[in-house]
Amino acid sequence: SNDDLWSAIAGDFEAAAQVLPSSQPQVGRADKTAAYAYLAKTRLYQAYEQDENHNVVNINQERLQQVLDATEQVMGMHQLEEDFAYNFLPGSFENGQEAVFSIQFSNNDGTLHGRLNYSDVLATPQGIGCCDFHKPSQNLVNAYKVDEQGLPLFSNYNQSNLDFNSLENYRVDPRLYHTVAIPGLPWKYDQENIYQENWVRSPSTYGYTASLKENVTEDSEYLVNIDPFYGNSKNRIEIRYADVLLMRAEALIELGRQNEALPLINEVRERANQSTTLISSYATNTGISPYLDGENINWTQDVAREALRWERRLELAMEGNRFFDLVRWGIAEETLNKYYSEEAEEATYYEGAFFDEGREEYLPIPQAQINFSQDVYVQNTGY
């Protein structure tokens, strides 16, 4: 069953946590806290019990407690970087205090191109490489707007588009400028290299933004020409401490202990607010505020849940978590089909797009694996 498979995965992480050391002599090797962080993530997904159409029918309280138990082992072993940007810079910034587990890359191992991050070679903009894939949506950009109190515009954030020409009209979350490249602003903080509209692949179709987190500056020693593509050797953080804090907060909220989750979410927000060192020259209005129960927000369980989900979207944007979060919460269909419907008004390539609930939450199981299991595995619904 689905629950059996989650338990098998959790069992592997539990076993790893028992035998791995608290620290490793070689950089990049998994340690005890990494195992506990992944155990927490596994138990969090397992807690959301779903029917065959992936609707959440129960949130298992015992599993949520296991999330708290596992994250407790990570608390204090890592901490947030002083600046959000430091998680996404190469060289001395890699393997920092927030990185719980990272995939290691290099460009100096003696081979022609080194151990480059080939998974991101297509994410470099056309202006400095190829091929401008993995692009932030306009919807995501708009989500970084905040109100006069520095809180998210939960319900009306997408009523107008945020771009370079309208930045002065909005107050925004500083994380926008560490996540999204906007024409007219420096590329990866380089004042001598302004991100241009002509760097973009088919802008009239796909928009003018690009992803910043996995990229480096054009003159960086970590950017390597592997003609016709450009790769870089910057590590990719697979799980970081901010994610652990938000997983713990999510478990607390679903246990009805949202008041205990509040300082965890605020810890992430307060770090985001002070992450302005590298963007201080940008002529923009940035600044967000912590949630203050009874002052700027009424911190009920429902409100806390919405705030937590919003925080995960902004904090972890373009890091590969969003779709899986939506599936875990059982809201992939409603979220994505609403998105397709709204975006199709401006982005014509979304016309006719839809998310097939009960099928597209998961990929099909390869037939070879079903054969190897001697039909113990049953093909996912809809395939």
Region locations from a protein language model:
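Acidic/polar-rich alpha-helix caps and helix-coil junctions
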Residues: 1-117, 149-383
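Short, cationic low-complexity segments
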Residues: 120-145, 199-206
